């Protein structure tokens, strides 16, 4: 059946901001879908609040709405655009839940909009735990014994039948949010309480414990003719109990017998048919008892999921693209396989390699969080690797994680028996580093039986780790490194650095020996069919195998180094810039993407001309360069777009003779080295906050005394404010050094392993961010962003406004001339990000980064200027004048905005509700100089209040328009809150406050109701504390600023209760003032919606009138 002719326009809902459990994989899925639907001649309308996505680039849809994904806003877009159909299966749980809400509100029926890709009945059957249990029974399969509950009373009743431990799973949530394993009644009350709260249907499933069972997933697709394909089987290395997003996973499943696999396949096909998914894909999770082989079906996602992205990249089978075609009427046998060009999508992929995915965590950003891995997903990113065997793929994936301690190591002596026993004991608890603990225990002599008993990891996987230990033993035992043993190590994934560690040699020496033996990796191709048909798409992975499959080429190649796994501080924003470079340089150059993140658009096989799915280490990049050099000229390597990961390789790559494009490595070092950068600022006459560099505690104290407290301390060469703190006195400085600074040298006089930077902290300064382009002669200023929060909160966590609202024309001119002086002094070619602080009319330079920043996509969306594309063309040799002439850049840059320009607000999205302390409470929500946000949204409207209100709706579900607001602020903030509180009273809000804040408000004539602090306990007549009121849902918004660095217990209790209750929490006075303006904007009426294309047309109209935009 060809495409349906009754559909002319489709609304696609994206997934919104990057959050734990719903990340960049949905940008990849949505981008593919939008591309396909437009190829089919359909008008595509897209709504997504995340400006850092490729899918929100105006060329991917006919009407692109960067608006909050709420039922009310999407209903406004439907009323305006009148689409024929709504496709909700490519935007994660957010899109699915929004579609259900629109259906239940009657909006889809009112505007005659058909749901495609999934029907409401199928969504309910798959997502509603009780109904899905019935589906499984009708298919002749088993679920775990379970009960459904809607209240805590029902939960406790179910526990009496099921016993402990038991698993709590809420309906209609993603990433395991609100789920957990309860070992007793106290656990159960806490976990089930959260689960009922987070489930939109206030429903949880309580099921018998299947902890320790083996966990598998099948990725399936079905069309309207009932053709079903199993795209991929995935096996979790960790047993049931760890969320699949937090487990190391393997494709294809390796420890199933053929009979077991066929059983899972039969059940999976029966379930997809019974649920009724007939125009798309789904993911089904299974548990298998390791001894009896009993199979239970855990759950199903009736949509494109995180696993779909992994399965797509693992097999080369583009699930999202095919799902979009199925949704508009095609059948699987009518859709061609892009990679072979000669087989249809109804041919199931076959793998002749092994794929391993390893998650990346960010517990270091949340020191109070419990590092235990459970059924609630906590990882912030992932890396994937391909190899000819499991050990090769595993070791490549572990080094792709790009984090200290994430790889197997053989440093020093093997652990003694006592330490080995401790390692085995520690491995009983699933944590981020469990596999490394197992490997170290094997070094110390632990047996396979001991480790299986401790971890319940399948013996086959454990045996593979013993195999690695054998290879390491052979490496250590030989007198000299011969070709045979070195080739054996490389076939098992050992890096040159690991071999060097085992042999006590330098990494460069090992590389020289390896090259002398002619030992280099070859590059195989992902072809979906185990070499049965010829592959037309160059999607490569390395292996120490026989023959390479890299084809000769005529055009010069450009290597673009991606950003690796998402992490806090280096996320999808950097992938965005890499994709833009690939798109801009295609044609004149052969674009070659090197990356290892399966979630992203950059690792789609048709983004660049060639894709190498490889770790971003010096060794791996060097080998890709050599492979490409062997088949044609290489013009250059781009390192400035992928964040700190590729940037940190720049100097070593240049020293090895590789042609680095754009800003040279010595200029990158000049911006990072405080001494050299200080000289650039002095030469340009630009002030910076007083600073110093220390390599010991004594030096650190002397520097802090000289420049005066408070000071900002941090290690050098970090991204995302890693390890950065504001320190108020010498005791805190000493504590910081002991906690956060690795040291070398003798115990009585330790020396820091790398210098610590100490800056004077500017209190009450306005922080400003600038993104600009420089070609060596001319500056193009992309945009000036003014932060809503004052300096001291990491720029990645602060809300910011473009164009700036309180900066004068004179101040903006100073910002422009200062940016140009820095670009010239450092020697930038390409992108530059500068952060300034304006304090007492002095413009201080905080830092400069000669690379793509995380604000580049936001500036591009707000101004319509593709900065990353322009930067890549500058690196290729163009000038800013050339780019203006070719239309890549407008005639006038973004220094000054037209008075009628709309306002864009970027808001950070923080993952606090995912992280709980060991006591079970949410971690503290206070912001500081270390970045903690996982993603961002954009609010776009005619003025700041409306844009800010949209940003809050997009990030956190919105601001209240009536009800109760609780206010308790530090003494220094009490004067600042008077006017915003007075305005809330005028708007009809009831104000609750603690005694101190209430006294100040009373003196200003503002009535408030005094409530008890948590530390006061309940009153003599049972009066509730503020935490009780928040938990009971009786407070609609909380304003609480932290009280210096002293005792924070009350504030902590208030903030964590607010986060757990899912209510808006404001922790700075500037944010409070903006929130009050936002509340007023909401009360004036529903949000107006406008597409980026409409904004671009208005901007063009202003320019043709002779007034710059």
Swiss-Prot record:
Which residues of the sequence carry a binding annotation for Mn(2+) 2?
299, 301
Segments carrying the region annotation (Carbamoyl phosphate synthetic domain) are 549-956
Cellular component per GO? cytoplasm
Q: Which residues are Mg(2+) 1-binding?
A: 285, 299
Q: Which residues bind Mn(2+) 1?
A: 285, 299
Name the cofactor(s) required for activity, per the record.
Mg(2+); Mn(2+)
UniProtKB keywords: Amino-acid biosynthesis, Arginine biosynthesis, ATP-binding, Ligase, Magnesium, Manganese, Metal-binding, Nucleotide-binding, Pyrimidine biosynthesis, Repeat
Q: Does the keyword Iron-sulfur apply?
A: no
Keyword Metal-binding (UniProt): yes
Task: Using the UniProt annotation, give all residue ranges assigned to the region (Carboxyphosphate synthetic domain).
Answer: 1-402
Q: Domain named MGS-like: which ranges?
A: 957-1102
Task: Specify which residues bind Mn(2+) 3 according to the UniProt entry for this protein.
Answer: 835, 847
Task: Give the reactions, separated by semicolons, that this protein catalyses.
Answer: hydrogencarbonate + L-glutamine + 2 ATP + H2O = carbamoyl phosphate + L-glutamate + 2 ADP + phosphate + 2 H(+)
InterPro entries attached to this UniProt entry: ATP-grasp (IPR011761), ATP_grasp_subdomain_1 (IPR013815), CarbamoylP_synth_lsu (IPR006275), CarbamoylP_synth_lsu_oligo (IPR005480), CarbamoylP_synth_lsu_oligo_sf (IPR036897), CbamoylP_synth_lsu-like_ATP-bd (IPR005479), CbamoylP_synth_lsu_CPSase_dom (IPR005483), MGS-like_dom (IPR011607)
Q: How does it assemble?
A: Composed of two chains; the small (or glutamine) chain promotes the hydrolysis of glutamine to ammonia, which is used by the large (or ammonia) chain to synthesize carbamoyl phosphate. Tetramer of heterodimers (alpha,beta)4.
Q: What does this chain do?
A: Large subunit of the glutamine-dependent carbamoyl phosphate synthetase (CPSase). CPSase catalyzes the formation of carbamoyl phosphate from the ammonia moiety of glutamine, carbonate, and phosphate donated by ATP, constituting the first step of 2 biosynthetic pathways, one leading to arginine and/or urea and the other to pyrimidine nucleotides.
Checking PANTHER family in the record gives: CARBAMOYL-PHOSPHATE SYNTHASE [AMMONIA], MITOCHONDRIAL (PTHR11405:SF53), CARBAMOYLTRANSFERASE FAMILY MEMBER (PTHR11405)
Q: What is this protein called?
A: Carbamoyl phosphate synthase large chain
What is the species of this protein?
A: Beutenbergia cavernae (strain ATCC BAA-8 / DSM 12333 / CCUG 43141 / JCM 11478 / NBRC 16432 / NCIMB 13614 / HKI 0122)
Taxonomy of origin reads: Bacteria, Bacillati, Actinomycetota, Actinomycetes, Micrococcales
State the gene name recorded for this protein.
carB
